[in-house]
């Protein structure tokens, strides 16, 4: 019920990764990367399916060897989400996964081989309508740029990116997106700002090697949040030394916080104090776990007392305001019922699921009505 943020997205060209539109106003895609051995087909497929279940739009898979390329073929046959093959050094691997239906190639033209090998990869991508992601990373800058700048700088990352962009321009290939990642927030943010002024291709955002689940989420939220609030970014990955599923969850949380894209429940909860009338923290933790399957966008406020509870409930899809023994339940800003504090979790879960079903049905009817008008 909150207003959408007035963020003006940077204009960019449109590409497709599989069936997912990227750029030109398309929803910002959230992606992750598998951390299994790609040659372990079963483990990799299971991880990709877990990522699909939490909403991953795109999944990247490292393909370092020809054996991994053969495994990629089997993996691709068993999943639905578009797959990006992460390839370095050996152009033949890129050609092989292209045969196997890869949806996007992540390469650096600078380390894939000489001009002829780059041309072979680009020609193959063009023939099969496969986009490319140019991935520049502060930790693997070209030696001459390291010597020129002394250390990774925004200008160094920009020069590296433009060098690779020029490779593709010379080959008349424009179906690509670009990333300029760094583990330092300020370095990454300024690099993306510079790049956004130079090209109109889609940008893939990330703070690389951000850290563990907690620290990495914080760094990513700050860095990606700054860029997204300025309208920069068309896809994103939150890089965590953690279960890749957490990367997708944090990615959507960042987008939800900026009111850019919503998926599932946005919980609004107080940090609690001695005024709370029920166990707010336990309630929120339990509901977050129980309701992970809900993809309907909705705001749910869970506030332990009447100080801020009614105000938050006014702008929430559903809201609970703590009261003595029973707490007020609000729906779309209107007080509807009272819930027993001793059975709060089960009651609220049932109400949320019912509301989600109601909203889904309303959207289904709206879509049907629009279809009738069009036809």
Swiss-Prot record:
InterPro entries from the entry?
Dihydropteroate_synth-like_sf (IPR011005), IspG_bac (IPR016425), IspG_bac-typ (IPR004588), NO2/SO3_Rdtase_4Fe4S_sf (IPR045854)
Which reactions is this enzyme annotated as catalysing? (2E)-4-hydroxy-3-methylbut-2-enyl diphosphate + oxidized [flavodoxin] + H2O + 2 H(+) = 2-C-methyl-D-erythritol 2,4-cyclic diphosphate + reduced [flavodoxin]
The EC designation for this entry is 1.17.7.3
Q: In which pathway does it act?
A: Isoprenoid biosynthesis; isopentenyl diphosphate biosynthesis via DXP pathway; isopentenyl diphosphate from 1-deoxy-D-xylulose 5-phosphate: step 5/6
What are the disulphide bonds in this sequence?
none
Q: Which cofactors are reported in the record for this sequence?
A: [4Fe-4S] cluster
Instruction: Give GO BP annotations, semicolon-separated.
Output: isopentenyl diphosphate biosynthetic process, methylerythritol 4-phosphate pathway; terpenoid biosynthetic process
Q: Which residues bind [4Fe-4S] cluster?
A: 270, 273, 305, 312
Q: Do the record's keywords include Metal-binding?
A: yes
An example of a Pfam family matching this protein is GcpE
- Where would you find the membrane-spanning parts of this chain? none
Q: Which keywords does the record carry?
A: 4Fe-4S, Iron, Iron-sulfur, Isoprene biosynthesis, Metal-binding, Oxidoreductase
Note on cofactor: Binds 1 [4Fe-4S] cluster.
A single Gene Ontology MF term assigned here is: iron ion binding
The free-text function statement in the UniProt record for this protein reads: Converts 2C-methyl-D-erythritol 2,4-cyclodiphosphate (ME-2,4cPP) into 1-hydroxy-2-methyl-2-(E)-butenyl 4-diphosphate.
The family assignment reads: Belongs to the IspG family.
Q: What is this protein called?
A: 4-hydroxy-3-methylbut-2-en-1-yl diphosphate synthase (flavodoxin)
Q: Which organism does this record belong to?
A: Shigella flexneri
Gene field: ispG
